Amino acid sequence: MSYNRTLHSTTSILKMNSALQISCLLLVLGCLLGSGHGQSDAEFAAKSREISQIFGNPSVDKYTKVRNLPALVAFYEKYSSRLRLTAQEKKGIDNAIRQYRAQQNQKVDGVSAQGGTLFDILKKVVEVIIKVVV
């Protein structure tokens, strides 16, 4: 009889330990996810300011803006769900980015295309994103 009681007690303790471990794991995950969301809010705000300073400032030269187009595209792709865009604006931006990527992928003698109309393709995108971010 004492063997059954000991076995029962050990089983209860194992179940309790498992429940405690799962609770701790859920608590840690909750904290990580919560702080991750807070970090992404801060990161979104910082990236928005950075994009606005580059593309929303008329004193920044065209070369600097063209050089930062990949950052603008990455910003849009990462945070597009946070930007308040109409369906038409979103469709236009997606099409412009598709054109931009197609032009970036074109090779001339094994080298990516340089300059050209890259900025012109995304000029409207820049205007819409800056309007939404600011």
Curated annotation (Swiss-Prot):
Keywords for the protein's UniProt record, in alphabetical order: Immunity, Innate immunity, Secreted, Signal
Q: Where in the cell is it found?
A: Secreted
Name the Gene Ontology biological process terms: cellular response to heat; innate immune response; response to bacterium; response to heat
Could you confirm whether the keyword Secreted appears in this record? Answer: yes
Listed under GO cellular component are: extracellular space
A Pfam family annotated for this UniProt entry: Turandot
**Signal peptide positions on this chain:** 1-38
Broad class of where this protein is predominantly found: secreted
- Family per similarity comment: Belongs to the Turandot family.
Its function? A humoral factor that may play a role in stress tolerance.
What name appears for this protein in its UniProt entry? Protein Turandot E
Source species, please?
Drosophila yakuba (Fruit fly)
Query: What gene is it encoded by?
Result: TotE
